[in-house]
Every structure is written in structure tokens, then in C-alpha cells.
Amino acid sequence: GVRLVGSEMCIRDRCKNTFTSREGFGLFGIIQGGMFETLRKKCSEKLSKIGFDGYALGGLSVGESHEEMIKSIDFSLENIDEDKPRYLMGVGRPIDIFAAVERGVDMFDCVLPTRFGRNGRAFTSNGEINLRNAIYLKDDSPLDEGLDLYVSQNFSKSYIPVSYTHLTLPTIAVV
């Protein structure tokens, strides 16, 4: 673990020295170290000294609990300048995103919301639901009465899966 973090730093240092700055582009250092506080702190400290345009947190959302992820985010960001962009890789559950934003994370990317949508699932203020379950087939209540969003208030739980099917079938037929 420690030797790997050290060898990765050599590569990152060379990468930083080789990178040619261009308008609209930035080079991010990726903080690694699994669930090990000492490795993540060491990695973030060394990356901060190298000085990147932003910092990404990698190696999270791979089976650890929400609490373990939050702890890892906390000690990963201890040495990172607050004025630099912070990017959390591969995290897509709302509870994780909200907790990360509270800790200063700025950017996210994840296939989870798209995958959930494709498979008839939705995130609501009451948790995740599967709109393909029989209980929602004739449920004309809004998707989420607790959210003041257009979709949440104007489309029912029964309408969303039907509309998705009607929108995707012509595309599939063309392909």
C-alpha cells in the first residue's frame, strides 16, 4: 500500500511536469488509498505539494458503507486547498452526493442515476422506488410530493414508466 502510493506519486509528478496548460483544460490529481486514513492523507498531502488544477477522489463507492465513505472523504480533503475543484468519482446516490457537497465536493459523475432511470427506478425524498412494481401501475399520485419540482409534481408514478416505454420503443425500432 505505502510503496504503491509512493510510486504513483512519481508518475503523477512526471505527469504534472509534462502537462502543457491549455485554455479550458485542467489536470487533476487523483487521491487514492482505499479505506486507509494514513494512505489517503499521505496521497492528498503529496498531491497538494505537486499542485494540480483540481483533485479527484477515487476508489470510493466500491462496497463500503456510507459512513466509511464519508470518513474517507473527510480525511482525503484535509490537505486540499478549498479553492481548487474537488471531484468525487463514481458516486451517484443522493444521500452520498448531499454529504459530499456538505464537505466541499464540487463535481460528480456516475452511471447510477441513468441506470436506475433505464430500469424504472427513481430516487425520491423517501428513498428509492421501483416504478415497475405492480403497486405503482395504477398509482396516479405525484412521483414525489415532498419535492417542489416540475417532474415530481406533474407526472404520476404510473405515467413515468409508460412514457419512457413510448419514447424508447421508436428508437429501438429504428435501430
Predicted regions and their residues:
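Single conserved hydrophobic/aromatic residue that forms the stacking wall/gate
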Residues: 1-6, 166-175
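Active-site loops and adjacent core secondary-structure elements that bind or stabilize anionic groups
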Residues: 9-10
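PLP-dependent aspartate aminotransferase-fold enzymes
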Residues: 15
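Glycine-rich phosphate/ribose-binding loops and adjacent secondary-structure elements
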Residues: 18, 22-143, 147
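Alpha-helical hinge/cap motifs
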Residues: 90-92, 160, 168-171
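C-terminal extensions of enzymes
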Residues: 144-167
